Amino acid sequence: MRNVKNYTPKEIVAELDKYIVGQKEAKKSVAVALRNRYRRSLLPEDFKEEVTPKNILMVGPTGVGKTEIARRIAKLVEAPFVKVEATKFTEVGYVGRDVDSMVRDLVEAAVRMVKEEKLKAVTEKAKKLAEERLIDYLLGKKKKQPKNPFEMIFNYPSSERTEEPDNVDSYKREEIRQRLRSGELDNHMVEIEVTDTTPPMLEMYTNLGAEELNITLQDMFSDLLPKKKKLRKVTVAEAKKILEAEEAQNLIDMDEVIEEAVKRAENDGIIFIDEIDKIASTGYSAGPDVSREGVQRDLLPIIEGCTVMTKYGPVKTDYILFIAAGAFNVAKVSDLIPELQGRFPIRVNLKPLTKEDFVRILKEPKNALTKQYQELLRTEGVEIKYTEEAIETIAEVAYLINQQSEDIGARRLHTVMEKLFEDLSFHAPELSGQEIVITADYVKEQLKDSLNKYEVNKYIL
């Protein structure tokens, strides 16, 4: 696995600490699971096949960091990663998404990732080729291309152009090259010929689900039919970007990209299944549980290890890491079918957030809400400062409202902060150049309606 080999479990936890407060146990479990992917890659081939990832089940109330841990992990390790909602799936045979689609989504993510890497690797070469093409267009030098038989059959516009002598003054080319590189020609208009990437409107679907065998005519005949060209009149600056992208695309081997992507999805892929508690059968409902027990049974072979057909070929799920998360406030973990429970050997309980956690959430993370509002209002020329008491009061209000109503964890801070900054955000353009200090009294004044509504006024000192 790329990147993660540079991180020890302790370093992975340290990276997560920059964005997520507390939940050490969950962070440690995820860090060890990621490090084990790297350790497995170093094993001898004959033994490597015997080592499968230990899937993780994160249990905890909403808003304590389950999804955020998954999001940050995906960015950190740069592995193919997809996040899916368990509630979106239905049992095979019913209308809706089937569980195989999560594996197809993972492969798509892997293809995008590998393709971006390959495109990045050929950027410099693509720039040079694009520059030569652009100089040709600016000089009016156009090549005469033979007409493809298919172009005549399908009435494609002719690619024929007037060919100019090859002895175009090299001095003139060099002069245009220098003007191009200096940006002098950026606003000039130029007509360029590009490949038409608009997909055909007609698509073929099977009754197995729209995305299961969604075969477009473009996929079927892309190699057979000629690429349709079209003329576009754009600025030179825009033409550079368009031609660079087209040349880069021509330089990469998509077969190689797909082969690498499938391999990476199989060995490094991570699938995060959110809201898994919502497909637990509580025993209170009558009738068929289309999106509950049936979905759980469909998940079993994928998590255990099977082969899923995708448009890029068969993909084995044996070594994909599955991380599931759920609040389990209505259903219990034991309400999941026993076979599915057994597929998640590592179980982590995330703790509800305390007032002290809220204070830390407002102060410590790199993307703390307090910092976000400071930066947003700084764009209007307004400087925001917070007193220590103000931050503690905001945390206390959020915590108490959670206690008195639905506990939505750290998401409550978004509601409280938005209400707190409602007036300031509205009047910010008129306050340009001023420094505003947020005090505890200001917080109480701005949030008095919320405090009265939830009757938490009496709890705040």
UniProtKB/Swiss-Prot annotation:
Keywords in UniProt for this one?
A: ATP-binding, Chaperone, Cytoplasm, Nucleotide-binding
Domain of life from the UniProt record? Bacteria
Where is this gene product found? Cytoplasm
| InterPro entries registered for this protein in UniProt | AAA+_ATPase (IPR003593), ATP-dep_Clp_protease_ClpX (IPR050052), ATPase_AAA_core (IPR003959), Clp_ATPase_C (IPR019489), HslU (IPR004491), P-loop_NTPase (IPR027417)
Q: Mind naming one GO cellular-component term on file for this protein?
A: HslUV protease complex
Binding-site residues for ATP, renumbered to this chain? 21, 63-68, 274, 339, 411
Which GO terms fall under biological process for this protein?
protein unfolding; proteolysis involved in protein catabolic process
Q: What is its main location?
A: cytoplasm
Q: Which GO terms describe its molecular function?
A: ATP binding; ATP hydrolysis activity; peptidase activity; proteasome-activating activity
Q: How does it assemble?
A: A double ring-shaped homohexamer of HslV is capped on each side by a ring-shaped HslU homohexamer. The assembly of the HslU/HslV complex is dependent on binding of ATP.
Q: What does this protein do?
A: ATPase subunit of a proteasome-like degradation complex; this subunit has chaperone activity. The binding of ATP and its subsequent hydrolysis by HslU are essential for unfolding of protein substrates subsequently hydrolyzed by HslV. HslU recognizes the N-terminal part of its protein substrates and unfolds these before they are guided to HslV for hydrolysis.
What HAMAP family does the record tag this protein with?
Answer: HslU (MF_00249)
What family name appears in the similarity comment? Belongs to the ClpX chaperone family. HslU subfamily.
Q: What is this protein called?
A: ATP-dependent protease ATPase subunit HslU
Q: Which organism is it from?
A: Caldanaerobacter subterraneus subsp. tengcongensis (strain DSM 15242 / JCM 11007 / NBRC 100824 / MB4)
